[in-house]
Amino acid sequence: DGQGQYIHQQGPAPQQLEADGVGHIAAALGPMVGACAFSSLAAMPDWLNSDDGRAFCSAYARARRYMASTPAADIASAQKPLFPGINEAVLTQCIHAYQEMGCWPPEMAISAEGYNTMLDIFAFDQKITKRHAYDAICYRLV
């Protein structure tokens, strides 16, 4: 009859519902949206240039490289305790899909494309009334 019940969730929850036979993934938004700075870190330039800021950025960059280059099954095995209700094969599938979408690129700077896509989403949802310029918001680490 053209009606259904839909929810929006991030992985691995929808993949587990599908694996359990109680749901179906109708669409994945990530490939349609493309690069997006939705999950970003915020800090003041003074802190970023401090010893703590540089140490954090170095560790964060290593973590991103690890997520981008390590086999999904190895990551899933290490992260499994954080997802007690999720089957490890499902977690592996989800991590692999995120890797394929480029969710953890080695470059940690927010691209202008990703920033503008985020603003498009926020504007569509009427969460912002003004688009701040990329250069006014995004700080380039040197």
Where do the language-model regions lie?
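Pocket-lining segment of extracytoplasmic ligand-binding domains
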Residues: 1-83
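Residue-level detector of short coil/turn "hinge" positions at structural boundaries
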Residues: 24, 129-130
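Alpha-helix initiation/capping motif
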Residues: 26-28, 41-44, 87-90, 111, ...
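Glycine-rich, flexible loop/turn motifs
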Residues: 37, 44, 100, 106, ...
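Secondary-structure end/capping motifs
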Residues: 49-128
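Hinge/cleft segment of the Venus flytrap/periplasmic-binding protein
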Residues: 131-142
